[in-house]
Design a protein with these regions (language model features):
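N-terminal amphipathic, basic helical "cap/leader" segment at the start of enzyme domains
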Residues: 2-148, 317, 323
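Conserved beta-strand/loop scaffold segments within soluble protein domains that form the structured core
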Residues: 108-118, 126-397, 411, 415-449
């Protein structure tokens, strides 16, 4: 199966590379052929590869999806038809339709001088040297077949640039819409650059506007300069036919701060990868994950926190609630390199299987090559406490309501760690509705009403 999956993408590029390049930018095209050769060599990672042991990637890419290589215009008016409201949260709102930045007939967003939120291709045409400095530099195509595939197929994307010492007062919200009349594969690319002392918060919301089979690959590269602060929230509310493979690469300089949060409320199969590297001392990161899955949904989170230098702090907390026949996986690796003294690293994965048929695979790991560190890791997998359920039923609470309350109390810890208060309040509401079976799609979307 894997060889067939790879062959269809190799054949696709060999027959359509001119078309792909025609509708993209020279900077993106400059690395395309090398990425293709890397994919030819690497292929899709098999389960024999440690970081992919829990999810069969070739099966995800096996179906024959359509691709919009000619960049045909997709009829959609996202601002009028699609809303993803977070009450009391004032955002600068942008849309990405499939894998293209949408800039038609949208209200103009006022941004501080020098801040850029725009099409990656557009900026690459205007300032190719700037894009070439960052594009495909930390997302290395010679190390991962999925990243290589995305790099030789991606034709556009989103650029977010925050200049030195600029602090954004408003959250930048990017709504990624999957829209198609046929089964479709999209390949998104996001480049985020925060210069020294910059501060910004980003909320990425993934939604599907049509009940089609979608495959979305996504590569995010984020450069966080010295003394800069990045808050990144990634929320997925799609449907059971959606396949999502997201690789996030973050590079932190000295005394920088990153708060990374991934929330999966509705999906089909989701595979999230986070690679974060400390390049300067005094940096810190907080990585949180909230997963709710039921039926046959699959959610696989894989993280690598690379302490290349000392005096850095990392904290990870991922929590899963699995119902039905859902399957979850978490593998986290904390890597404390030689000479990275005074490292503090905490990695925790806690999981609740609400049924006997739900399955969770967990593998927290630490590799420590320095002797003056404070590092700990742990994981738990359990079911609802029968004694607690009985206690609540004896006091007039129905079994279903008691189950809901215990699940909500369990997942609440990770939600409360999310610093964006309006989003946190919204998630409390959405998670409760999700547990009650009342939330089938994003309730803020006009298309879903």
């Amino acid at each position: 199966m894997a060889m067939f999956s790879e062959k269809q993408y190799l054949d696709l590029y060999q027959s359509s590379s001119r078309m792909i390049k025609k509708h993209s930018a020279e900077v993106l095209n400059a690395v395309r052929d090398a990425a293709f050769e890397d994919f030819r060599r690497l292929g899709f990672p098999s389960r024999k590869v440690e970081r992919y042991k829990y999810t069969d990637m070739s099966a995800i890419f096996e179906p024959d999806y359509g691709l919009n290589l000619n960049r045909l215009e997709i009829p959609v008016d996202p601002y009028q038809a699609f809303r993803c409201d977070v009450p009391n949260l004032s955002t600068s709102l942008y849309f990405v339709v499939n894998d293209a930045f949408y800039n038609k007939a949208l209200p103009k967003v006022e941004l501080p001088e020098g801040v850029i939120v725009d099409s990656l291709c557009k900026v690459a045409a205007e300032n190719p040297e700037f894009i070439a400095k960052y594009y495909a530099k930390i997302a290395k195509t010679d190390e991962d077949g999925i990243t290589a595939l995305n790099t030789f197929l991606a034709q556009d994307g989103l650029l977010i640039y925050i200049p030195k010492n600029v602090k954004l007062d408003r959250t930048v919200q990017v709504i990624n819409i999957l829209r198609s009349d046929v089964d479709l594969m999209v390949n998104r690319r996001v480049l985020i650059v925060l210069e020294q002392g910059a501060e910004a918060k980003f909320l990425f919301c993934d939604h599907a506007a049509d009940d089609k089979n979608f495959l979305a690959t996504q590569v995010i590269e984020a450069y966080v300069g010295e003394n800069a602060s990045l808050d990144l929230y990634c929320l997925e509310e799609t449907h059971y036919k959606n396949r999502r493979v997201s690789n996030v690469y973050i590079e932190q300089q000295a005394n920088s701060r990153v708060n990374h949060n991934v929330i999966t409320l509705h999906n089909g199969i989701t595979r999230n990868r986070l690679d974060l590297v400390f390049k300067g001392e005094g940096a810190e990161c907080f990585c949180n994950g909230c997963v709710i899955a039921d039926k046959n949904q699959v959610v696989d989170n894989n993280t690598l926190i690379d302490h290349q230098v000392g005096h850095c702090t990392s904290n990870e907390l991922y929590k899963y609630v699995l119902d039905g026949e859902a399957r979850g996986a978490f593998a986290g690796r904390g890597w404390d390199r030689h000479g990275a003294q005074k490292t503090t690293a905490q990695e925790t994965n806690q999981n609740l299987c609400a049924t006997k048929t739900a399955r969770m695979f967990t593998q927290p790991m630490l590799e420590i090559y320095a002797d003056d560190v404070k590092c700990a890791h742990g994981s738990t997998v359990g079911q609802l406490n029968d004694a607690a359920l009985f206690y609540m039923q004896q006091r007039g609470v129905s079994r279903e309501e008691a189950k809901l309350l215990l699940q909500f109390a369990f997942i609440n810890e990770v939600i409360d760690k999310m610093e964006l208060e309006p989003l946190r309040d919204r998630l409390h509401h959405l998670v409760e509705k999700r547990f009650r079976g009342e939330l089938n799609k994003c309730e803020g979307c006009k298309l879903c009403k």
